[in-house]
């Protein structure tokens, strides 16, 4: 285990990034008539890869303690955790969705860990990460030990189910509803998984990247404003 006072930047050699997409043109859009040169841009879209040991800071202690805690209940670490990522001095555990409640329970209840607070749930949509298009991210806080860890779960677009953490962290109630509302992730076991911001009869999930851009034509001094995906931008 590494020292809590150790600077993680001195201990980490980041693993290879995972390329999930290649984006061409300005904001990935084509056919805009742009003359600024941005249309020739080619960028790879990457996610941080698995980090090697030592992780640095208190991260090794958290991972080692969680490993022992899971094993005491017959759960192997590699079966529950897909990869460990340390990026920008933050620890993220990528969790298998079936193991999410077990991992969260151990992180909360083990006195050596005591991540007693979940700060929310965020959704992310990676449409080109085949089989892992939808991600749910849970930042956890240990008030007892002044530590943070992030849990991340990925599910396919065709089966967007994740076990709800409401029974373990009741504060996720509205956050899971919001993530369902905007991304379409279904949190199994949530007591009332309904929309929270969009109308109940709304079609689709507005923060997904495949959600169509909309626009209302507005007249301004005799001119019509085109929809957002047809406008030029020079800044």
Swiss-Prot record:
Gene3D superfamilies: NADH:ubiquinone oxidoreductase, 30kDa subunit. It catalyses: a quinone + NADH + 5 H(+)(in) = a quinol + NAD(+) + 4 H(+)(out). It is a peripheral membrane protein. GO terms for molecular function: NADH dehydrogenase (ubiquinone) activity; NADH:ubiquinone reductase (non-electrogenic) activity; quinone binding. Keywords: Cell membrane, Membrane, NAD, Quinone, Translocase, Transport. It comes from the Bacteria. It is found in: Cell membrane. PANTHER family: NADH DEHYDROGENASE [UBIQUINONE] IRON-SULFUR PROTEIN 3, MITOCHONDRIAL, NADH DEHYDROGENASE UBIQUINONE IRON-SULFUR PROTEIN 3. NDH-1 shuttles electrons from NADH, via FMN and iron-sulfur (Fe-S) centers, to quinones in the respiratory chain. The immediate electron acceptor for the enzyme in this species is believed to be a menaquinone. Couples the redox reaction to proton translocation (for every two electrons transferred, four hydrogen ions are translocated across the cytoplasmic membrane), and thus conserves the redox energy in a proton gradient. NCBIfam families: NuoC_fam (TIGR01961), PRK07785.1 (NF005856). Belongs to the complex I 30 kDa subunit family. This is NADH-quinone oxidoreductase subunit C. It comes from Mycobacterium avium (strain 104). The lineage of its organism: Bacteria, Bacillati, Actinomycetota, Actinomycetes, Mycobacteriales. The gene is nuoC.
């Amino acid at each position: 285990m590494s020292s809590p006072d150790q600077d993680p930047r001195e201990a980490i050699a980041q693993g290879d990034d995972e390329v999930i997409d290649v984006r061409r043109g300005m904001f990935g859009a084509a056919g805009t008539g742009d003359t600024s040169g941005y249309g020739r841009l080619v960028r790879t879209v990457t996610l941080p890869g698995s980090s090697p040991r030592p992780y640095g800071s208190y991260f090794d202690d958290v991972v080692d303690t969680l490993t022992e805690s899971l094993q005491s209940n017959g759960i192997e670490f590699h079966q529950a955790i897909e990869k460990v990522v340390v990026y920008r001095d933050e620890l993220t555990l990528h969790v298998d969705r079936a193991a999410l409640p077990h991992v969260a329970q151990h992180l909360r209840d083990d006195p050596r860990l005591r991540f007693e607070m979940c700060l929310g749930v965020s959704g992310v949509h990676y449409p080109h990460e085949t089989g892992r298009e939808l991600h749910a991210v849970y930042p956890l806080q240990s008030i007892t030990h002044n530590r943070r860890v992030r849990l991340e779960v990925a599910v396919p677009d065709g089966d967007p189910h994740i076990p709800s953490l409401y029974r373990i962290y009741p504060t996720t109630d509205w956050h899971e509803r919001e993530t369902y509302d905007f991304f379409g992730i279904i949190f199994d076991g949530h007591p009332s998984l309904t929309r929270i911001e969009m109308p109940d009869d709304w079609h689709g999930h507005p923060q997904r990247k495949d959600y169509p851009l909309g626009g209302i034509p507005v007249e301004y001094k005799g001119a019509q404003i085109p929809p957002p995906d047809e406008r030029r931008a020079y800044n």
